[in-house]
Amino acid sequence: MFDIGWSELLVIGVVALIAIGPKELPGVLRMVGQWMGKARKMASEFQGQFNEAMREAEMADLKKSFDDIKATANTFSRDNIMTSLQKDVDAAMTIDKIEHIDTSPVEPTTPEPPTAETLLEAETHAASISAATAVTEVGEPLAITQEIHPALPSPEPAAAIAIAPIKDAKAS
């Protein structure tokens, strides 16, 4: 603490013995010891109060940080994506309730096959559009046209086709 070595303490002890005398030396040493005890006690109290103040300041900082995080979390929970997802899931769960509603079944309908008149209209419409604009736009509906089937040759009778004998690869 004071950076005093053993030799320096011995010199102080000899000077105190000569200056104070052997009769009063124990009382003086006791008083010096009490002063040293009081000084150490005051130093430890100061250090304890300083450490407590540091802990309180640190706790105040931690409390402030915690409050900031809590406020941020509250703003996220109000506009939370999970909240909107939960609402979507809840809405999807109501589909089960829709099954209990009495509705008459809808008859499926099939479109009528195209007639010669509708094919002719589609071809004239496609021709007028391709003449008016060279580039076809993406959003335009496709024209209905008649499929052209090539004439299929008549199949030959099965007797005319010569069947080659099947050979076993292992046998040869």
Swiss-Prot record:
GO terms for cellular component: TAT protein transport complex. Part of the twin-arginine translocation (Tat) system that transports large folded proteins containing a characteristic twin-arginine motif in their signal peptide across membranes. Together with TatC, TatB is part of a receptor directly interacting with Tat signal peptides. TatB may form an oligomeric binding site that transiently accommodates folded Tat precursor proteins before their translocation. PANTHER family: SEC-INDEPENDENT PROTEIN TRANSLOCASE PROTEIN TATA, CHLOROPLASTIC. It is a single-pass membrane protein. Disulfide bonds: none annotated. The gene is tatB. This is Sec-independent protein translocase protein TatB. The keyword Kinase does not apply.
